[in-house]
């Protein structure tokens, strides 16, 4: 079994999968035409005087708008970030109207990608946008927006998308053949109904809400995602999330610049200056990002004890500074700016950190960071501090939107990351091996 060698100096290998890989995973629209049609339709319905006069903004959106107008610095940033932007939203009034439309609906399966990111992409890509979107006070309001959307997505009223219908030429219900094909791409020869707990003979396959569907459970984990090597082998470290590899880094620094091209982890920022941080200096990290249609629960990578769980408030729409001003939409030779920012995002975004002390002392303490990306409401742990878990046991889940995760090893850990994950966009199946002890 090949492993990645330890590096003698700081080394970061940003895998940066191709735009086509991101597109297949639902992070990008399938074409500029799809994006333009979405924006034109949303603009036509919401960016006009009739909508503004007849439709009441959801309270958190009105609070968001009031905050912008009452804070002189934030107000000027919201004026500046829209300068030169010709396609709606062209001002914060239109942005709030678009939020008001999106946050009243559950996402459909389709060719677009995350809808909130689609309307935020251009203003994220400005210096004024970066300045505004890194402010704690503004992110407090973003969290309120997503919490409100989350309440709707957890309600029975969100189930209208859990059907086999085609809504228009680019949007489908989640039980349409097109959507099922996308969801089952990494389960060859299997069907949705056989892999996940549901009942195709009752309305909505028995799911109580969109979020219930989003966090679906395996019917038989041992068949579709077995714990590779068996639970009793404590020398093995499994994948915590179903994902694609994005980054492998060794000799990670306690403090590192967050603005360099190529990205770098800064442990003090990534781990929110936790007292455990020094143990991971010069250690290794593997990071993956999740398919929009993927399984969104987390499994334990080791047999061990949950030592600490930390919820970190952070940003939602701040892309890496070196990417600001890059072309949007980008060509197929390079991902768009936001998707070149995943390492940076892990340092500053809203996230949950989980420390686990492995039973095997050759592994010792590890960390997991579960990171929300754009329209993500919460990261929810379903375990508690002091609880013992086995490899493959449930740890928690992402809610509502796109996500990334990182797993960190101490410098003194005898576990090494498998070499296969050095390939861009390598599929990481939950419960498969990502590292193993080598003495």
Curated annotation (Swiss-Prot):
Which terms under GO biological process does the entry name? phosphatidylethanolamine biosynthetic process; psilocybin biosynthetic process
Which EC number applies?
4.1.1.105
* Coiled-coil residues: none
Its uses in biotechnology?
A: The pharmaceutical interesting psilocybin as a treatment option against depression and anxiety is being investigated in advanced clinical trials.
A Pfam family the protein falls into: PSDC
Q: Which family does it belong to?
A: Belongs to the phosphatidylserine decarboxylase family.
Name recorded for this polypeptide:
L-tryptophan decarboxylase
Q: Which organism is it from?
A: Psilocybe cyanescens
Provide the organism lineage as a comma list.
Answer: Eukaryota, Fungi, Dikarya, Basidiomycota, Agaricomycotina
Gene this protein is translated from: psiD
